[in-house]
Amino acid sequence: MNNLNSVFDYEDIQLIPNKCVINSRLEADTSVKLGNFTFKLPVVPANMQTIIDDKIAEMLAKEGYFYIMHRFEAENRAAFIKKMHQQGLIASISVGVKADEHAFIREISADALIPEFITIDIAHGHADSVIKTIQLIKRLMPQTFVIAGNVGTPEAVRELENAGADATKVGIGPGKVCITKVKTGFGTGGWQLAAVKWCAKAASKPVIADGGIRTHGDIAKSIRMGATMVMVGSLFAAHEESPGQTVERDGQLFKEYFGSASEYQKGEHKNVEGKKILLPHKGSLKDTLKEMEEDLQSSISYAGGRDLSALTKVDYVVVKNSIWNGDAI
């Protein structure tokens, strides 16, 4: 493991500006390549039931954004792949690691329903079960880009890459509705950005930073530390289009947002590592995506470059928990 004293998180880091070389931030290119595809932003909405559904997946794919469909309506996944392909769109799904999921992988392979992306999505991804699932997918569908996670250590990244994963997802419980750290004592909460840095250093393939993103500036910080893509939950929750239920409180509209390991998700109170919260209604998802793009373009201009690669080279300072100076976000 790296020097455990050098841990930091998003609010502890400030990036240092370089001389600007573009006339307008609109010249900055925020696109990113993942596998054989190029996407508009290095951002993917979390594959959670209160964040993404079929409609949002279609909208994102049509507009040139990356998406990962959640795995919580397992029986609809084959039809989802078919529907996306019929429209000439990429299919990007999630799977678990149990026997029924292996049967599903064999089934879509036999039916030639080959998704472009499969994300193996479990809470503790440094596991033999994940390695076996990677190997199964790669044996049956070698052309499919496999994302595996979630992990929090360089050792885990190396092992999953060696098993055949094309990218790893880094983050154990730093998310807003994840309580893994409280329930188990384990996780990357409080040092998620350092975990991204260490894991990216060990990686030879893309790393997706997953969890703990509270502001658009955190996306730039993730890229600085080596992430290719950033998975975002709470910032994408509670939009007009979001699947979460709308609730009215004191004349204000809110939407539900819950974790993938919450009892609301599982439908039972067993091994619960997530909770449910209400977030203020945020308007249109397209507006948020546009604002994210503009903020990232500004980040690139501050980095002194023309595209995302500029962010990987900037200097930064560690300002222990003080960038807010007591202000709320």
UniProtKB/Swiss-Prot annotation:
A Gene Ontology BP annotation from the UniProt entry: purine nucleotide metabolic process
Record EC number: 1.7.1.7
InterPro entries per the UniProt record, alphabetical: Aldolase_TIM, GMP_reductase, GuaC_type_2, IMP_DH/GMP_Rdtase_CS, IMP_DH_GMPRt
Catalytic residues of the enzyme: C178 (thioimidate intermediate)
Pfam families from the UniProt entry: IMPDH
One GO CC term, this protein: cytosol
Binding site for NADP(+): 207-230
Top class in the EC scheme: oxidoreductase
Source species, domain of life: Bacteria
Catalytic reactions on record: IMP + NH4(+) + NADP(+) = GMP + NADPH + 2 H(+)
Keywords: NADP, Oxidoreductase
The keyword Nucleotidyltransferase is assigned to this record: no
Family in the record: Belongs to the IMPDH/GMPR family. GuaC type 2 subfamily.
UniProt function note: Catalyzes the irreversible NADPH-dependent deamination of GMP to IMP. It functions in the conversion of nucleobase, nucleoside and nucleotide derivatives of G to A nucleotides, and in maintaining the intracellular balance of A and G nucleotides.
PANTHER family, per the entry: GMP REDUCTASE
UniProt protein name: GMP reductase
Gene name of this polypeptide: guaC
